[in-house]
């Protein structure tokens, strides 16, 4: 799975891994996984972090090696890519005219009528929170942040 990483990513992740390999034995404590991920700019939920720790620490010794970490990062990037594709497809549903943004009225209608519907006040609060640049529309980056609860950069 590490094959899904670019050579640059592999080099970067190996370097960061080595920073946490305090004893120089090729192992990092699973307790350090959150700090390691945070340094990369990934902030998983506690549940995701527990699952990741379980994935990299198969022998339950409380440590993981660089290969396991690279496999984990490959899986993470693959999931991120899949999520991005799903979000792009959803965004296109709302951006029917391919303007690159979603009108407030369109989004408000969807938020109030689809899935677990929000009331008008909740929908407006969510949209105001999502509209980071205050232009009255939701662009793709704002849409992703709203849907995932995370900030998103197109450079990822």
From Swiss-Prot:
Annotated Gene Ontology cellular component terms: cytoplasm; myosin II complex
Binding site for Ca(2+): 131, 133, 135, 137, 142
Cellular compartment(s): Cytoplasm
Alphabetized GO MF terms: calcium ion binding
SMART domains with a match to the protein in the record: EFh
Keyword Cytoplasm: yes
Keywords (A to Z) from UniProt: Calcium, Cytoplasm, Metal-binding, Repeat
Disulfide bonds: none
UniProt note on tissues of expression: Expressed by the venom gland.
InterPro entries listed in its UniProt record: CALM/Myosin/TropC-like, EF-hand-dom_pair, EF_Hand_1_Ca_BS, EF_hand_dom
Keyword Repressor tagged: no
The EF-hand domain, residue ranges: 8-43, 44-79, 82-117, 118-153
CDD domains from the UniProt entry: EFh (cd00051)
Function field: May be involved in the cellular control mechanism of the secretion of toxins from the gland into the venom.
PANTHER family, alphabetized: CALMODULIN 2, MYOSIN LIGHT CHAIN 1, 3
Similarity field: Belongs to the calmodulin family. Calglandulin subfamily.
Official protein name in the record: Calglandulin
């Amino acid at each position: 799975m590490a094959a899904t990483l670019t050579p640059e990513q592999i080099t970067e992740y190996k370097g960061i891994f080595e920073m946490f390999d305090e004893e120089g034995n090729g192992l990092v404590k699973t307790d350090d996984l959150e700090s390691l991920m945070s340094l990369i700019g990934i902030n998983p939920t506690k549940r995701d972090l527990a699952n990741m720790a379980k994935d990299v620490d198969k022998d339950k010794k409380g440590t993981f090696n660089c290969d396991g970490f690279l496999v984990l990062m490959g899986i993470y990037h693959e999931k991120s890519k899949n999520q991005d594709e799903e979000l792009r497809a959803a965004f296109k549903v709302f951006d029917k005219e391919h303007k690159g943004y979603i009108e407030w009225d369109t989004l408000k209608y969807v938020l109030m009528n689809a899935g677990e519907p929000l009331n008008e006040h909740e929908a407006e609060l969510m949209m105001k929170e999502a509209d980071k640049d205050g232009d009255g529309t939701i662009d793709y980056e704002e849409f992703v942040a709203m849907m995932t609860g995370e900030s998103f950069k197109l450079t990822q």
